[in-house]
Design a protein with these regions (language model features):
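Alpha-helix capping/helix-boundary segments
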Residues: 137-139
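N-terminal subdomain of nucleotide-sugar transferases
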Residues: 1-45, 62, 66-68
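Membrane-proximal helix-turn-helix segments that form the acceptor-binding/catalytic region
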Residues: 87-98, 114-130
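Acidic-and-aromatic substrate-binding clefts and catalytic sites of carbohydrate-active enzymes
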Residues: 78-84, 109-115, 158-161
């Protein structure tokens, strides 16, 4: 029996609190997430900067096809044309790599209208090997609007366990 290696995931992004909390704090020997490559048009030397994501280009996929097994898109595609996303999906398909989409936003609050985001989602939803979303309500919208069956994985906590478990003061306010 041959030795197995971890599944190598190119996440968009990798260095984001949501993505970091998808794995146990001690790590998961069955999955390795690639570090975020330097962003396109980088204006910072900050290693935590991941946007705009280079992974979402056909060129990056072609140059790094041997470095990963699966792509996982969370967000970061809001500045891309739908045609660029099609080219990216074509490059993944040519390389034999599927991608998973986590549909976080059904409406992008940074866009003045819904048109561009819906066109982007249309491309990604039609090409993804699997779609994940965070709530049953979002899954229903994805099914009604795009005919997509999505798995629901509720949002993981994004604060440290110590903070999450600390006692809270009683109060009458609403947060």
């Amino acid at each position: 029996m041959g030795e197995t290696r971890p599944i190598r995931v190119a996440s968009v992004p990798t260095n984001h609190v949501y993505v970091r909390h998808l794995s146990p704090p001690e790590g998961d020997p069955t999955i390795t997430r690639l570090p975020d490559p330097p962003p396109l048009r980088a204006t910072s030397t900050d290693q935590s900067q991941w946007w705009p994501p280079a992974i979402l280009t056909a060129e990056w996929v072609r140059e790094h096809a041997d470095d990963f097994d699966l792509a996982h898109v969370h967000f970061g595609f809001d500045a891309l044309d739908p045609e660029d996303l099609e080219a990216w999906a074509d490059a993944l398909e040519a390389a034999g790599h599927p991608f998973v989409l986590t549909a976080h936003d059904l409406r992008n609050p940074h866009h003045p209208t819904a048109d561009l985001h819906e066109a982007q989602l249309g491309v990604l939803l039609s090409r993804a090997a699997h779609v994940i979303t965070l709530s049953e309500a979002a899954a229903e919208v994805l099914n009604e609007r795009w005919g997509v069956e999505a798995s629901v994985l509720p949002h993981p906590h994004v604060v440290d366990e110590d903070w999450l478990e600390r006692p809270r003061l009683e109060h009458d306010g609403f947060v």
